[in-house]
């Protein structure tokens, strides 16, 4: 139900573009234009036909809004504001606006092209912007994972990642740039449409010229909106997509080597704001250092740009950024605090308006020492010593964390890694353990299945003699995770892509303490 509009959006584009082309080409071929120029005006005739097509489009949109809602309710999944808003946005973008684009495409072809040429242009546009376009666009670059992302962003109007397992935490992307795509193409087709009307209209030519200018403006605004940087979860074959960005980066940038720090971070105070990407103010309380120099080396994923580093007195400290390493200089070995301001995103583990998935092992906050984050795939890294965390998250959607939620909405507690989830996510308590899960996953996260599999794991845990603290199980999205990422054991909680596989992964050797 969640992905129905997105899987069919290419069909809506095909249907309305061909229907529009037939309607308007017949109008042009019947020579009706010459008859109406001297009477009601050519614009009113085309406007009337367009209104009929738009009315049909509205009806289709309403149906494909109500049907997924009804299906979701009948399936027993929780009906939340996030789910209703998502289905509404999906219907607007992938049904209505795709239908409008189809009408515009057909009108453009009817006004400017001959019969067969028009069909050819429509066919090529649909081919490039539909699901097959992802493979076609990669051919000139010698294969997948090499084409520039802007090319995919320009042409791939269909949802990306339909051939991959759905991310039930997130859904398919409905970020602002997806609407900017439609705006660009509506403007691109609207410009020649209104220029043509200005040529053939008997009157109101200035109105059509103004509409042409507005279309050009829409095209420019759409282009600007498309290229704005930020966190985008894109399971596509583009060079910088969620699938390929890290592999391409580390092909030309050596991953950091493992080198233990001569200090520890005693506590973190993280103030995070999530909009188009992650914006962070991190206050770190450091232990004494045994080093002779005044430098501290941290690991912070290279996708985050450090704006400033200051000490406890507010003095700016010099720092150097090289790949995943951050080297801070200018202070002695005494205990002190550092305040770092940085912003950015991880290409696969997203932080945007639609959702958050920030595992505690990807160094989205500074970790002490030099750590290797990539070795043929993402390598989970955790500090040797747990720290005290206080985490505040300003996000459009509710955020879930394994740390205890405080009255002011922050999270706090001692851990060796903080994981944050947001989106189509909920939590429940089973067997004394909090389970954070994607409620749209009707396979493993139906209430009865979730309870059964969690209790099975807890029994296996007791049988294995695992006495380590366990307060939370966090079910993570499956987004091309490496084997090491699929189940991660922290000091006080577990994250994994499936509860049913936790016992086999953690206790395969028959030992509980590992």
Predicted regions mapped to residue ranges:
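Hydrophobic alpha-helical transmembrane segments
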Residues: 1-27, 197-209, 219, 434-449, ...
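Helix-loop-helix units of permease transmembrane domains in multi-pass membrane transporters
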Residues: 19-59
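Juxtacatalytic substrate-recognition/specificity segment
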Residues: 391, 427-514
């Amino acid at each position: 139900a969640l992905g129905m509009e997105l899987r069919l959006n290419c069909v809506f584009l095909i249907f309305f573009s061909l229907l529009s082309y037939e309607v308007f080409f017949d109008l042009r071929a019947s020579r009706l234009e010459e008859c109406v120029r001297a009477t009601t005006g050519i614009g009113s005739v085309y406007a009337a036909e367009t209104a009929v097509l738009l009315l049909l489009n509205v009806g289709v949109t309403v149906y494909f809004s109500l049907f997924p809602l009804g299906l979701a309710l009948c399936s027993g999944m929780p009906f939340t504001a996030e789910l209703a808003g998502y289905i509404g946005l999906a219907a607007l973008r992938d049904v209505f606006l795709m239908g409008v684009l189809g009408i515009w495409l057909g009108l453009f072809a009817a006004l400017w092209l001959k019969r067969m040429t028009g069909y050819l242009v429509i066919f090529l546009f649909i081919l490039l912007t539909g699901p097959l376009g992802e493979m076609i666009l990669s051919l000139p670059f010698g294969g997948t994972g090499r084409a520039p992302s802007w090319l995919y962003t320009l042409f791939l109007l269909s949802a990306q990642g339909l051939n991959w397992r759905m991310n039930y935490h997130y859904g398919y992307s409905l970020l602002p740039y997806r609407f900017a795509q439609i705006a660009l193409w509506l403007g691109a087709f609207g410009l020649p449409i209104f220029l043509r009307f200005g040529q053939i209209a008997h009157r109101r030519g200035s109105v059509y010229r103004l509409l042409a200018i507005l279309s050009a403006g829409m095209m420019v605004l759409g282009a600007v909106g498309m290229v704005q940087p930020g966190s985008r979860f894109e399971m596509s074959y583009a060079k910088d997509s969620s699938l390929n960005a890290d592999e391409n980066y580390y092909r030309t940038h050596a991953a950091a080597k493992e080198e233990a720090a001569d200090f520890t971070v005693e506590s973190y105070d993280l103030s995070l704001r999530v909009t188009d990407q992650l914006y962070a103010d991190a206050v770190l309380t450091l232990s004494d250092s045994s080093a002779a120099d005044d430098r501290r080396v941290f690991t912070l994923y290279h996708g985050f740009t450090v704006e400033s580093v200051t000490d406890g007195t507010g003095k700016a400290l010099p720092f150097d950024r090289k790949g995943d390493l951050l080297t801070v200089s200018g202070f002695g070995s005494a205990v002190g605090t550092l305040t770092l301001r940085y912003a950015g995103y991880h290409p696969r583990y997203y932080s945007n308006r639609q959702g958050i998935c920030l595992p505690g092992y990807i160094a989205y906050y500074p970790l002490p020492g030099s750590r290797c984050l990539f070795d043929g795939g993402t390598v989970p890294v955790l500090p040797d010593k747990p720290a005290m965390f206080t985490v505040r998250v300003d996000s459009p959607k509710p955020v879930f964390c394994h740390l205890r939620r405080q009255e002011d909405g922050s999270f706090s507690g001692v851990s060796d890694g903080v994981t944050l989830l947001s989106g189509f996510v909920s939590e429940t308590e089973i067997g004394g353990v909090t389970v954070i899960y994607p409620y749209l996953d009707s396979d493993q996260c139906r209430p009865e299945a979730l309870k059964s599999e969690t209790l099975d794991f807890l029994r296996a845990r007791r049988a294995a003699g695992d006495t380590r603290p366990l307060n939370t199980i966090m079910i993570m999205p499956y987004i091309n995770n490496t084997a090491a990422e699929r189940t991660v054991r922290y000091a006080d909680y577990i994250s994994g892509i499936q509860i049913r596989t936790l016992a086999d992964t953690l206790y395969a050797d028959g030992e509980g303490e590992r």
